[in-house]
A protein has these predicted regions:
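Alpha-helical membrane-associated segments of multi-pass integral membrane proteins
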Residues: 26, 87-128
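Interfacial non-cytosolic loop connecting adjacent transmembrane helices
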Residues: 34-39, 72-101
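Short, amphipathic, aromatic/basic-enriched membrane-interface segments that mark the entry/exit
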Residues: 6-12, 28-39
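Membrane-embedded alpha-helical segments in integral membrane proteins
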Residues: 17-31
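Cytosolic juxtamembrane helix and N-cap/initiation of the first transmembrane helix
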Residues: 1-21, 110, 117-120, 124
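Membrane-embedded alpha-helical transmembrane segments of multi-pass integral membrane proteins
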Residues: 22-25, 43-47, 67-74, 106, ...
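Short, aromatic-rich membrane-interface segments at the entry and exit
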Residues: 33-42, 59-64
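Loop-to-transmembrane helix junctions at the membrane interface
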Residues: 48-79
Length: 128
């Protein structure tokens, strides 16, 4: 059972799919709230995540590491949104913060676990 959980957490494809959910959410935010110019940030990140899904290995880990670093810079704001219930001027999100923030933190964990597994060569894709 523990190995099944570790295999799930260290699978780069699972991490890429979780990141894709975040990208799709941000595409919605671009059209609904921020404006289409926000896609200038979102689409390249989506491209990195898609490339990591298909490439795998150490190159895939490096591709996935770039959005993960961006997520880590946002962690203080994420924690602030969880503790205060306000999401930095995005008050229209409201209670959705309590759904989005844990998912985002889980995605960061998935990213880190899969990056380590791919970099070490211990993932299930290491021999393929």
């Amino acid at each position: 059972m523990n190995m099944a959980i570790m295999n799930f957490l260290s699978d780069i494809r699972n991490a890429a799919l979780a990141n894709a959910v975040i990208v799709v959410f941000h595409v919605y935010i671009a059209f609904a709230v921020e404006g289409v110019s926000f896609l200038v940030i979102v689409l390249p990140i989506g491209g990195l995540i898609a490339a990591a899904y298909f490439v795998k290995g150490k190159i895939g880990a490096a591709l996935l590491a770039l959005p993960t670093l961006g997520y880590l810079f946002a962690v203080p704001d994420i924690v602030g949104a969880l503790t205060t219930g306000e999401s930095g001027g995005d008050d229209h999100i409201g209670w959705g913060v309590y759904i989005l923030v844990p998912f985002w933190l889980f995605t960061i964990l998935l990213n880190i676990m899969s990056i380590v597994a791919e970099a070490r060569g211990t993932s299930k894709y290491a021999n393929s």
